[in-house]
Amino acid sequence: MSKNIRINEIPSGERPREKLLFYGAQFLSNEELLAIILRTGNKDSNVVELSYRIIHSVGGLNGLFKASAKELMEVKGVKEAKATQILAMCELYKRFKVSELAQVKISKPSDVAKLVLDELRMLRQEVLILINLDTKNKVISKKEIFKGGLNSSLVHPREIFREAVKDSAASIIICHNHPSGDPTPSRDDINITTRLKECGKMMGIELLDHLIIGDNRFISLKEKDIL
């Protein structure tokens, strides 16, 4: 799309809002959907071009939902108003996902993988996620606990069980990713799991599983009889 074309010069059938009403939202690109939310561009770009620049500057949709106001405003053409529009949209989506979690019951490792695989598999650094469960193995919450190089000296059970107690969890599952794409457990992974299992016994909050996420695959330490 030429930068000389303004949004009102685009044929009406190709404008994002009109396309959504005629074809349905599922037929629009990510950039077109964001353009509808932002509504206007600026003197240099129409709103579709601006949306393209935003999404690609922050690393795609995954980056968009994790971007801060400061990071968004570093994109040319994005001021405070548009940054807050994007942040509000992202927060609404996150709240919807939290409400959706309440309907999820965990009965096998693949149920857990569905909750975290897409979120963790493409990250460039290790992230540890805690899933708190009630007495019927329904998900209470899903929380990011730690980010960075995971090892047994840095991941302290106190941080994990503090969140479990706060949410009145009956049991927990932890998940973390291997940026290499290989989910084979390391010695540190096994040590962390052992420590958490013992702490859980003392606190009456059972560690049900530890999933390691690789590139579109995962390993359950429970299934491997490590837990």
Swiss-Prot record:
Provide the alphabetized UniProt keywords.
Hydrolase, Metal-binding, Metalloprotease, Protease, Zinc
UniProt cross-references to CDD domains, sorted A to Z: MPN_DUF2466 (cd08071)
Summarize where Zn(2+) binds, as residue positions. Answer: 176, 178, 189
Care to name a GO molecular-function term for this sequence?
metal ion binding
Where is motif JAMM motif found?
A: 176-189
- The segment(s) forming the MPN domain are 105-227
State the family named in the UniProt similarity comment for this chain: Belongs to the UPF0758 family.
The record's annotation in NCBIfam families points to:
PRK00024.1, radc
Protein name listed in UniProt: UPF0758 protein CPF_2399
Question: What is the species listed in this Swiss-Prot or TrEMBL entry?
Answer: Clostridium perfringens (strain ATCC 13124 / DSM 756 / JCM 1290 / NCIMB 6125 / NCTC 8237 / Type A)
